[in-house]
Amino acid sequence: MTSKQLISVVDDDRFFRDSMRRLMRSLGYSSEAFASAADFLASPFLFETACLIADVNMPAMTGIELYRRLVESKRAIPTILVTAYPNDDDRIRAENDGVLCYLRKPVNEQELTDCVRGAMPAA
């Protein structure tokens, strides 16, 4: 028996969080959503997460800071960052740090789907 791969969504915008969770489930993945980086880091789902979708601009800890914290703790998760305020310098830094994709909101569903599928190990 195989279980569905878990995609965690971290975004302070409830509408975006819920829509991403529904989209991931429609693609056949399991999905959990969190309102903050702290909520995700404290979650039992942290170690089950196969791919992380995180907002760049969140209070307290940004998506970039969350990714760096995961890397520093030896728990790098394939990460897709999303933002309503894209910045080339931030994108370049994030990609150089190892972030898989840096996408602009509103997110293009096909582009996001391609990024998620690229993050998943081959079956």
Describe the role of every protein-language-model region.
Residues 58:
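Receiver (REC) domain active-site loop signature in two-component systems and cognate sites
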Residues 54-55:
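Active-site T/S-Asp motif of two-component receiver
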Residues 33-51:
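Acidic, metal-coordinating helix/loop segments flanking the phosphotransfer/catalytic sites
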Residues 49, 63, 94-100:
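As written
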Residues 89, 107-117:
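C-terminal output helix
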Residues 14-32, 119:
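Two-component/phosphorelay signaling modules centered on CheY-like receiver
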